Amino acid sequence: MYKNQLQELAQRSCFNLPSYTCIREGPDHAPRFKATVNFNGEIFESPQYCSTLRQAEHSAAEVALNALSNRGPSHSLAARILDETGVYKNLLQEIAQRVGAPLPRYTTFRSGLGHQPVFTGTVELAGITFTGDPAKNKKQAEKNAAMAAWSSLKQLAKETSSSMPEPENIDELEQVIIARALINYRIKENIGTGSSSSAPVPFAKKFFMQNLRPTSPQPSPATTSRILPFICPKQPSRSSRSSLAATSGIDRIMAAALESRSYQRPQQRFANPPYVPMRQFRSQCHGMAPPVTIRTAVPVFSAPPMPPPPCTNNTQLPSSVYVPSLMRTAPPVRIAPPVTIRTAVPVFASAPPVRIRTAVKPTVEAGETRISSVQEKESIPVLPDSLEIGVEGSTITITDCEKTASKETERAEFKDSSKGEPETARERLENLKI
């Protein structure tokens, strides 16, 4: 039981597990054992010899727990570990079974404000009532009552053993000694006999008991370690003491200087002020905020800004007129190209009407040459009606106009035939529609 509590305490404190060493004495038929436990480098020894090895180890673990719980830094931790596992309730139940009394009965009373209740617990054991310290909840109040009952019974057992002339057997368990002391106390106080009433009697004796678990644990000082609560607080060295004293002296001088400066007379304000470090007057603002820059946004499709009027020799812009940089360097505005509309003709649409031109064929008579208007536009040179070529022995007359007229006639017929092709295609489409 005590070994388990000591092991749990070591695990919560981030220490190595406790190690036990046993010493055996006496003959083989009646051996005696004495154990020592090493807890975080400290050695705790059982106060007496025990008949079994297990009892000796439990006795050494109990000594270690009692020693650790009595120390200042570890006071609340050891007591809390013993409380959370319900050790004291189990011990009281075992004492009640040894005495032959009914099991312990716990009662809690609530007091205080509604949002901050206070619970006080009492436990009745063998007709005796024990009252514990107040707590913030019922469960802790019952544990405090069991703790107070166990501490009172231990003190009663020590007082009884010291008053008895005959020495007791040192091999007996602590529970047996406490049960015997409780029986003697009941007989002495006439508790549970026919002459006394059946109502429970409060425990009359008052013993000096250490508060194994304070109701409101105080925070440990800054010099102690939270991880290693069993290390005693170190005493400050001489150098640290001198530095602390110097710091406190400087603080007092600073306070006095500030007070004298604030309450000095008006005629003494212009005297030399006392020296005060600048860190005392350090402002909260560590720097100036950057200036705010406002940018003017020009829409994309807006009209370009008006250019400034041209400066002549006589007229100049005043120096006070400010032209923004965006207006000075305005981007060029591009104008979209004109829209061109093209007429699309469907494939199966009817062909557009064709303008028919009638060409006038030239009429050539004998001895004359007539040229149409088309021939006149082409400005073809006109040859004389007849040419006389003199040849030896004979004269030959050639009429070139006849040749030219025949050529022009052939050209006109070729044009008429080419212009008549669309007309035949149109006639074909009309025939298909019909």
Curated annotation (Swiss-Prot):
Ranges of residues in domain DRBM: 1-70, 87-155
Predominant localisation class: cytoplasm
The keyword Transit peptide is annotated on this UniProt entry: no
One Pfam family hit: dsrm
Keyword hit for Nuclease: no
Gene that this sequence comes from: DRB2
InterPro entries registered for this protein in UniProt: AtDRB-like_DSRM_1, AtDRB-like_DSRM_2, dsRBD_dom
Keywords linked to the UniProt accession: Cytoplasm, Repeat, RNA-binding, RNA-mediated gene silencing
Region (Disordered): 402-434
Protein name as catalogued: Double-stranded RNA-binding protein 2
